[in-house]
């Protein structure tokens, strides 16, 4: 695995996105930290960093474990060591790619809206967890937000801040709730959430490249349409992932600073992008 990364804060504060890799470059962990509604100081970045480091530590000790079990163990340890309580803990989305050298397989895990994109010899595949997106799409608050932004209300006004707060509160009612048909699952102080992660495995011979990205980077392709997946793949190779996330950020600020074209929560979200190349080096 050859790994290249790009990261960028959405602006005005440190990024809460994280990319971590194992020392032997066979494991990539990408997380999008989420602070609680009541945090005076944002803790999402701290949580993402701490969980990512713990995941790698658990993996290094027990590489035979599947990714769900490894994540569950890491969640248990972080919650226990730091006294985190469900519903009042910072959280993180997570996406993980692991190369298993002993049997020439590649594993991927996705929990919440941080996808993994796979370029195989016959095309592209996106491994995603759509439960949060489905929940948001069903909320009437989302429709209000879209209408306000398309009408030119912008991101700075009290109306936008109010509806975003309502959306967050709506989401919190359904986070990590067993038996809730609208539940979505995220890394937080409920270790069992790991059992609900989306997982896949492929023979390494089937894969050319993979990309792991937070939703801020994904928006450049699926929301803004700046590239097709094939063009995005070529751009990552030609100019590198840092210039790709820079280009997405520039588009948001230069071409749609008020969210009229593409309604969203804020002008720019944090962005993290890891590019993984499995092709033999020359």
Language model segments and positions:
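PP2C/PPM-type serine/threonine phosphatase catalytic domain
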Residues: 1-282
């Amino acid at each position: 695995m050859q790994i290249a990364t790009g990261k960028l804060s959405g602006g005005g504060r440190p990024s809460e996105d994280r990319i971590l890799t194992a020392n032997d470059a066979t494991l990539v962990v990408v997380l999008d930290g989420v602070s609680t509604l009541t945090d005076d100081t944002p803790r999402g970045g701290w949580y993402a960093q701490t969980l990512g480091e713990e995941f790698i530590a658990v993996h290094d000790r027990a590489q035979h474990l599947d990714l769900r079990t490894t994540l569950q163990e890491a969640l248990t340890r972080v919650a226990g060591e730091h006294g985190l309580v469900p519903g009042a803990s910072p959280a993180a989305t997570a996406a993980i790619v692991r190369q298993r050298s002993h049997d020439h397989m590649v594993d991927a895990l996705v929990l919440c809206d941080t996808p993994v994109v796979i370029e195989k010899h016959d095309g592209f595949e996106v491994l995603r967890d759509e439960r949060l997106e489905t929940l948001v799409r069903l909320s009437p608050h989302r429709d209000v937000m879209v209408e306000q932004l398309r009408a030119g209300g912008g991101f700075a006004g009290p109306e936008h801040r109010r509806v975003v707060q309502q959306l967050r509160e709506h989401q919190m009612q359904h986070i990590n709730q067993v038996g809730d048909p609208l539940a979505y699952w995220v890394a937080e102080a409920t270790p069992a959430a790991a059992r609900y992660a989306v997982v896949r495995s492929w023979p390494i011979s089937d894969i050319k490249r993979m990309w792991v990205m937070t939703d801020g980077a994904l928006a450049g392709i699926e929301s803004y349409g700046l590239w097709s997946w094939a063009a995005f793949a070529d751009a990552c190779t030609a100019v590198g992932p840092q210039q790709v996330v820079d280009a997405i950020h520039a588009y948001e600020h230069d071409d749609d600073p008020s969210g009229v074209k593409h309604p969203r929560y804020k002008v720019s979200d944090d962005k993290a992008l890891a590019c993984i190349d499995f092709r033999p080096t020359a």
